Amino acid sequence: MARLSQVSPDELILDLENPRIPDARFANEIEAIAYLYSQADLGELIQSIGNSGWLDFEPLIVEESTRTVIEGNRRLAALRIIANHQLQQRFKVTLPKPLHLNAKPDEIQVNYVGSRNEARDFIGFKHVNGAFKWDSYAKAKFAHS
């Protein structure tokens, strides 16, 4: 059964076998972050968190025994870059100035699960049948209002 908790992002591990990236496996977190940065609009997410702060409204789903993030790898990768100057240099990321006070949270909300199978229903709904993706105009209009 899932269990809600607060945890330091530093204690979590990116999923090196992320099913959303079926054609790639990573040797380490740096490779996973590089892929997410180049292929999954991580730059936009970093800027959003940098400007508005971490919004803890949707818990990451984490396999408790391994601390592996099953759902929320983009968000964790963004936090990793925001918190690490060497990663910022590697990916040529310029953070907003001033950086929002809550852009580097000490703790984030996670939903611990016992296994990947326990998380499948939620992840399947979100990513297979999930919310309709907004186009650029809709995003801009919402941000402006």
Please describe what each predicted stretch is.
Residues M1-P98, E107-Q109:
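Short, charged/polar connector segments at secondary-structure boundaries
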